[in-house]
Amino acid sequence: MKTIKGPALFLAQFAGDDAPFNSWDSITKWAADCGYKGVQVPSWDGRLLALDGAASSKDYCDTFKGQAEENGVEVPELSTHLQGQLVAVHPAYDEAFDGFAAPEVRGNPSARLAWAVDQVKKAFSASANIG
């Protein structure tokens, strides 16, 4: 990007189980209606992005990006805030940070670390596929 195109919105603070915040289509329409030009996507929220699919499929990402653009916003970045924090957790914070991890790796610091690293790597691939 050579120039700033306008305000973008971090969707993690709005994503939820009720419309319009519970699906990619409706939340991107809502963001555009609010005047935003872009949306930062939380890569951990499956209601908005299937990270495994995005990491492995350019077609998935083309559809994902295309739907956002049809609704009036761009996807300037994916967020890995939660997973990234889990890549280097001091043992004193194990319990506090465990809630950021997938349920199947909670309580197991080495499994949580492996999961977090894998999530960040998948987000890199997904970001490349989105373009």
What role is predicted for each listed range?
Residues 1-129:
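N-terminal pre-domain/capping segments
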